[in-house]
Amino acid sequence: MIQAEEFVIVEKKHLDNFTILYVEGLIKLGESAEFFSSALENVLKNESTNVIIDFTKIDYIDSTGIGELVGYLGKFTTQNRKLIIVNPSERIQKLLKLAKLDAVFKIYNNEEEAIAAESGSPAPR
C-alpha cells in the first residue's frame, strides 16, 4: 500500500495488456493530486500497457484531480494507449457528466467489462 495524505494506491496489478490501479480516498488539490499524478506518470513511462483506474473507493475528486485525469488521458492517447475509469460512484459519474467528460473517458461498471470491451474478447463469467 502506497499512501499520501488522504489518497492511497491500495494495489496495482497487471492483466493482459492492462495495468489496473486500485485507489481509494480523495483526489484533490495538494499532495493527493500530486501523488495520483505520479502514479499515472510511473505507468506512462515505465510500462507499455493501457491503464484502468478503479474508482470504487474514491470518495471525492476536485477540479485538480479532474485536470490530472484529462491531462493523462491526452498523454496515454498520444502513445496509442488507453486510460479507462471503472466503478465510479454515482456522485463521480454525475460530476463527470456535468463536466461532459463522460463522453471523453471510457467508463465501465467493472474491470472485466472494460477489458472485454477494450481488448475485443468476451467478459469472463
Predicted regions: what is each one?
Residues 25, 89, 111:
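Short, flexible active-site-adjacent loop segments at beta-strand->alpha-helix junctions, enriched
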Residues 28-105:
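Amphipathic alpha-helical interaction surfaces in cytosolic regulatory modules
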Residues 106-110, 114:
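Short acidic-hydrophobic, aromatic-tinged amphipathic segments that line or gate anion-handling sites
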Residues 119-125:
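Short acidic DE-rich linear segments
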Residues 4-38:
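STAS-typified acidic loop motif
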Residues 13, 86, 108:
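General small-molecule cofactor/ligand-binding pocket signal
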